[in-house]
Amino acid sequence: MLTLTWSGAALAQSASAGAEIYEENCATCHGERLRPTGAAPDLKKLTADRKDFFEKMVNDGKGQMPAWGGVIADEQREAIWAYIRSRAG
């Protein structure tokens, strides 16, 4: 079994990259710096155990959420997740 772990520096770098990707692609609906202003869900409320749900929603979309699977690379999606988790509270 292979287990990958993130060092603190790598996670911070990923979260920083994720912040940029988020602001370019997600902030219109989910709010700048994860502060929602409309009907879109508050992503800060996504708990760590909801990563599979997050991935499915980003890749496949649902309702008002468009599918980003062919637009955002897996690494970019992971960076967005790191950013969301770094801001969760």
Tell me what each language-model feature is.
Residues 2-21, 50, 88-89:
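Electrostatic cytochrome c docking/interface patches
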Residues 37-46, 59-89:
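Axial heme c-ligation environment in periplasmic c-type cytochrome domains
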Residues 15-19, 23, 31-62:
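Gly/Gly-Pro-rich "capping" loops immediately C-terminal to redox-active cysteine motifs
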